[in-house]
From Swiss-Prot:
UniProt source species: Arabidopsis thaliana
Keywords noted in UniProt: Repeat
Name this protein carries in UniProt: ACT domain-containing protein ACR6
Gene3D superfamilies: 3.30.70.260
Record function comment: May bind amino acids.
Residue span, ACT domain: 30-110, 120-207, 250-326, 328-402
C-alpha cells in the first residue's frame, strides 16, 4: 500500500466529528470540527459555512501532528444564532461528507466543456466598460441562455464563470461545431484591447467550486501584479509576514470586514500550496483580523523576500477582488432569453460599468446582483440610477441600502501580535527570529 492509499485509509477509519453548540456562546452558534488533517481540510470546512451564507465572527484553528481541530463562531445574515434544526443537521452532514473530498491543485491554465445540465464557460481578459454586455449579447445571438454566472474585476483584469443552456432544449450544448463557434466569438470579444496580456475563453468540465475557480482564474491571469497603491490606506488591506521559531511564517491580515472574506483568504493560501497549522479570525464591523501560522506544503516557512512579497500581493488581491465597490443593484424578474443582454445593454447605454455581478435563475425567476460605477470608477449619480430603474422597471430593479460607513479601518486601534488571542496563546512557544 503506497502512502496516498494509506492516508485515504486513515481518513476512512477516522471520520470527522462535528459538534454544534448553541449554548456555549451568548451571541453565536459554535461549530467544532475534529478530523484527520490533510491539505485543504480547512478550506473544505470554510467552504461549507460560506455556501450556507453563514457569517464567521470568530475562528480558532489548530493542528497537532496528523489531527486537525477548528472552532467557529457563526451567525446568520441577520446576526442571529442558527436555530433551525434542519439547517444545523445539514451543516453537520455537509462538513462530514466534504471532509473526504479531494481538492485539486491550482490548474496552470484556464480551459469549455458541458455537463448534463449546462455548459460552463470561463473567461479571462482585460476589463473595460460594456464587456459583460457584449458577452451576453453574443450568447443571446447564439441562442444560449445564461442560467447563472459570476463576474469579477480587479486591477484592470476581468474573470467570469458562466453557465449556459440551449434555448430550445434547456440543457447543455454538446455539438462540438457549435461549441467551437461560441468559443471563437467570445474570444474575439474578450481579446479586444487585451494588449500584451492574453485573453482566454474556455469550456470547463472542472467541478471546482465556482468562487474558488474565479480566484484561480484571476491568479493565473496575474491580477495581483502592479496593483496601484494610490488608493487611500483606509481602503486597502494590510498584510504582514513574520518568520518565527519552529519554522512557521505568521501571516497577519487586517481589512474591512465583508461576506466570504475568510473563504477568500483560505482559498488563496490553499491554492498557493501553503498549509495553515494554527490561526485565529476575529471580525468586527470596523475591522476583520486574521492571523495564520503557515508553512509551504514541503514543510518550510517563507524564506525569500521575493516569495514574501508575492504572498502579500496575492492575499491583498484575494481580499480586494470582491470588495463591494460601487452601487449595489438587485434585479428580480421573470427569466427569459436575452434578459441579461437587455439589462447590461441598458447599463452600458447609461455609461455604467459593472465591477462585479452575480447572476442566478431559479424556478423561472431571475435574481441578479450588480455592483456598478460610472465609466471613470466614481459613484453613480442618483438621477441616472432612477432613469435606469424607470427603463427596466422600478419594481424589478432596486437599490440596496448601504450600511452606514464605519470609521477609518486603519485609524482604529488594533491589537498587537502579543495581545491577540492567538498571539497570546503562542507567544511563549514561538519567538520571533
Amino acid at each position: 500500500m503506497d502512502d496516498d492509499e494509506y492516508a485515504k485509509l486513515i481518513r476512512r477509519m477516522n471520520p470527522p466529528r462535528v459538534v454544534i453548540d448553541n449554548n456555549a456562546s451568548d451571541d453565536a452558534t459554535v461549530i467544532q470540527v475534529d478530523s484527520v488533517n490533510k491539505h485543504g481540510t480547512l478550506l473544505e470546512v470554510v467552504q461549507v459555512l460560506t455556501d450556507m451564507n453563514l457569517v464567521i465572527k470568530k475562528a480558532y484553528i489548530s493542528s497537532d501532528g496528523g489531527w486537525f481541530m477548528d472552532v467557529f463562531k457563526v451567525i446568520d445574515q441577520d446576526g442571529n444564532k442558527i436555530r433551525d434544526t434542519q439547517v444545523l443537521d445539514y451543516i453537520q452532514k455537509r462538513i462530514e461528507s466534504n471532509a473526504g473530498w479531494f481538492i485539486p491543485p491550482l490548474r496552470s491554465s484556464v480551459g469549455v466543456m458541458p455537463t448534463d445540465e449546462y455548459t460552463s464557460i470561463e473567461l479571462a481578459g482585460t476589463d473595460r466598460p460594456g464587456l459583460l454586455s457584449e458577452v451576453s449579447a453574443v450568447l443571446t445571438d447564439l441562442h444560449c441562455n445564461v442560467v447563472n454566472a459570476e463576474i469579477w474585476t480587479h486591477n484592470t483584469r476581468a474573470a467570469a464563470v458562466i453557465h449556459v443552456t440551449d434555448n430550445s432544449t434547456h440543457s447543455a450544448i454538446t455539438d462540438p461545431i457549435r461549441l467551437s463557434t461560441i468559443k471563437e466569438l467570445l474570444c474575439n470579444v474578450v481579446r479586444t484591447n487585451s494588449g500584451s496580456r492574453a485573453a482566454k475563453t474556455v469550456f470547463s468540465c472542472s467541478d471546482t467550486h465556482r468562487e474558488r475557480r474565479l480566484h484561480q482564474i484571476m491568479f493565473d491571469d496575474r491580477d495581483y501584479e502592479g496593483v496601484k497603491r494610490a488608493r487611500t490606506s483606509a481602503s486597502r488591506p494590510s498584510v504582514t509576514l513574520m518568520n518565527i521559531e519552529k519554522d512557521y511564517t505568521v501571516v497577519t491580515m487586517r481589512s474591512k470586514d465583508r461576506p466570504k472574506l475568510v473563504f477568500d483568504v483560505v482559498c488563496t493560501l490553499t491554492d498557493m500550496q501553503y498549509v495553515v497549522f494554527h490561526g485565529m479570525v476575529s471580525t468586527e464591523p470596523v475591522e476583520a483580523y486574521q492571523e495564520f501560522y503557515i508553512r509551504h506544503v514541503d514543510g518550510l516557512p517563507i524564506n525569500s523576500e521575493a516569495e514574501q512579497e508575492r504572498v502579500i500581493q496575492c492575499l491583498e488581491a484575494a481580499i480586494e477582488r470582491r470588495a463591494s465597490e460601487g452601487l449595489e443593484l438587485e434585479l428580480s424578474a421573470e427569466d427569459r432569453v436575452g434578459l441579461l443582454s437587455d439589462i447590461t445593454r441598458t447599463f452600458r447605454e447609461n455609461s455604467l460599468t459593472i465591477v462585479r455581478a452575480e447572476i442566478s435563475t431559479r424556478e423561472g425567476k431571475a435574481k441578479d446582483t450588480f455592483y456598478v460605477t460610472d465609466v471613470t470608477g466614481n459613484p453613480v449619480e442618483s438621477k441616472i440610477v432612477e432613469s435606469i430603474r424607470q427603463q427596466i422597471g422600478v419594481s424589478k430593479l432596486k437599490v440596496k441600502k448601504k450600511e452606514k460607513e464605519h470609521c477609518s479601518v486603519l485609524g482604529t486601534s488594533r491589537p498587537s501580535h502579543e495581545t491577540t488571542t492567538m498571539g497570546y496563546l503562542l507567544s511563549n512557544i514561538f519567538k520571533p527570529k
